[in-house]
A protein has these predicted regions:
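Small/polar/charged residue-enriched interaction surfaces, especially the RNA/DNA-contacting tracks
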Residues: 1-216
């Protein structure tokens, strides 16, 4: 079997937290790079992404304050996503091509077994204390909103085979929390006109504009 769904010891299908976190981070990274396209300090892989000593997290390039870096655990915590409804398994055979002859490489054929439209549920937790420790501005909430909106609209993928139409997703998001940030985030994701035209969101936009322009 070349590729199959991941299961726990009891046989339960799940999405590992690492896979969900990685997919979310990759989507957010694309957004960040688009916004900061003309600032190599915020985009380059050689930018400040090492927090080896105490308080170094405050000096990190903006993106890494939110998604973690060497010596700095990301303020976003993700749990394993569990399957909540039975889903049909669909096997598929893949043909391997010999790169020298252009013909079928029989011994290298492989098979995948995927789930058809499975539904998973899990939690993201944003640690506001860690955001504060990194001196991350309110822009982090807007970047989260952008990324969650993409997932709500089906723009994203998780796992193997995106080019083969595997891993597509369409998310549903429910925001819990009583902080002002949670209320605004709920409003953005719910297209609340009052929130979208509110002063709090204007502040987030200005904070993001400032963050992507910083020399880290």
């Amino acid at each position: 079997m070349g590729h199959c769904t991941i299961r726990k010891e009891d046989g339960a299908v799940y999405l590992p937290a690492e896979s969900v976190r990685g997919a979310f981070r990759a989507q957010a990274r694309r957004i960040w790079q688009t916004l900061a396209w003309d600032n190599h300090h915020q985009n380059a892989k050689t930018g400040n992404q090492n927090a080896a000593r105490k308080d170094d997290q405050k000096k990190l390039a903006g993106f890494f304050k939110l998604f973690g870096a060497t010596g700095w655990r990301a303020p976003i915590e993700v749990e394993d996503f569990r399957l909540v409804e039975a889903a049909e398994e669909r096997p598929q055979e893949f043909v391997a091509i010999d790169r020298f002859t252009g013909g079928v490489a029989g011994p290298k054929k492989f098979k995948a077994v995927a789930l058809w439209k499975p539904k998973f549920v899990g939690d993201f937790t944003v640690r506001t204390d860690r955001l504060g420790a990194a001196n991350a501005g309110s822009w982090v909430w807007l970047l989260l909103a952008f990324t969650l909106r993409d997932w709500l609209e089906g723009d994203g993928s998780i796992g193997f085979g995106r080019s083969k139409n595997y891993g597509g997703l369409e998310a549903k998001v429910e925001v819990f929390g009583t902080t002002p940030e949670a209320a605004v985030l709920r409003g953005i994701l719910g297209s609340d006109g009052g929130v979208l035209n509110g002063a709090e969101l204007v502040g987030w936009v200005r904070s993001l504009e400032s963050a992507i322009g910083e020399v880290a």
